[in-house]
């Protein structure tokens, strides 16, 4: 099994502060992620001055400013992104960013970005999808979130990507709910199983906006190949996404939990594992003498019983042994041996 690709979604939780963003890269590395992801945008190209805030944004940032004014404060200048990109790579992390406008697509293309994350809000943006699909970048991978979308809408977006030359094997579809945070009853992990059936030619992942790290860990047995999770250094920081993000400690628990579950999945066939083999002799039982038995005596339910250890004749041969004559003397608790009866393998 290929390890799940874990992405720490820094997004705009740096609040436009380069030093905060750099510290977040450090914490993501400590947590054990494979990559960090940012959001690249020019607020004036992304949001109209008439666009309202989302309900969750109003809840955490108030309604005194517009969505546009709020988002302007979260921009990360291109030159600072380049520095963060280089810094993250120096730590051994992959780094990529989601573009939200055409200028930002061009900028990230100039950086020869390999992984292109299409956010849920751009799923039905035809010119946006076409532009990313047509980028002449070698080994380009596309990851597409599906929050707020129906299955038919997802198929429409995938058709645009495929019609513009992107192979299904180079696309990862992320199950996603765009409510921040997503109520557990709306997470719908079973949708991942549905995706694996409907979109069997594609890679399937999970963009988790639910509280904590529980759903992320629980998604592993569904066969995901990619997971992203928003994280923050402090859930009380000003900004729209902090309260729906995990802390560095929670991010580490997510990473550790994912890796532990990956190792735990194992085989569909029930096997005796190397780690438990040594316990067979300790935990299983054998047929033993229940009292002193003289050579020639018949084995009966009175003079034999079953006790540990499990390296003698198996109790599964109980009725076969009854009525047989002892071939030697046995002391109480001594393992019974008899011609034709093998000792258990341990």
Task: Report the location of each language-model feature.
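Catalytic cores and adjacent flexible loops of soluble metabolic enzymes
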Residues: 1-346
């Amino acid at each position: 099994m290929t390890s799940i690709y874990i992405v720490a979604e820094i997004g705009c939780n740096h609040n436009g502060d380069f030093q905060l963003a750099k510290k977040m890269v450090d914490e993501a590395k400590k947590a054990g992620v494979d990559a960090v992801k940012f959001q690249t945008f020019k607020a004036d190209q992304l949001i109209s001055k008439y666009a309202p805030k989302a309900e969750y944004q109003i809840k955490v940032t108030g309604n005194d400013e517009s969505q546009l004014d709020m988002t302007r404060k979260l921009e990360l200048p291109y030159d600072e992104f380049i520095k963060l990109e280089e810094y993250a790579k120096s730590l051994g992390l992959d780094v990529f960013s989601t573009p939200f406008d055409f200028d930002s697509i061009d900028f990230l293309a100039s950086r020869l970005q390999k992984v292109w994350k299409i956010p849920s809000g751009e799923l039905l943006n035809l010119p946006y999808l076409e532009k990313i699909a047509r980028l002449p970048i070698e080994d380009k991978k596309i990851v597409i979130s599906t929050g707020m979308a129906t299955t038919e809408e997802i198929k429409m977006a995938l058709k645009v990507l495929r019609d513009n030359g992107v192979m299904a094997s180079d696309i990862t579809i992320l199950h996603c709910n765009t409510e921040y945070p997503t109520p557990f009853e709306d997470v719908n992990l079973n949708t991942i199983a549905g995706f694996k059936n409907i979109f069997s030619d594609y890679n399937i992942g999970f963009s988790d906006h639910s509280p904590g790290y529980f759903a992320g860990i629980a998604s592993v047995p569904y066969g995901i190949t990619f997971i992203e999770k928003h994280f923050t250094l402090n859930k009380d920081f000003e900004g729209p996404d902090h309260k729906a993000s995990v802390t560095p400690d929670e991010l580490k628990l997510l990473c550790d939990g994912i890796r532990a579950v990956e190792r735990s999945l194992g085989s569909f066939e029930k096997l005796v594992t190397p780690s438990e083999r040594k316990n067979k002799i300790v935990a299983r039982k054998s047929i033993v003498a229940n009292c002193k038995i003289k050579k020639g005596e018949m084995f009966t339910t009175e003079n034999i019983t079953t006790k540990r250890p499990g390296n003698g004749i198996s109790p599964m041969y109980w009725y076969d042994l009854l009525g047989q004559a002892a071939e030697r003397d046995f002391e109480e608790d001594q393992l019974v041996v008899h011609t034709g009866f093998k000792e258990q393998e341990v």
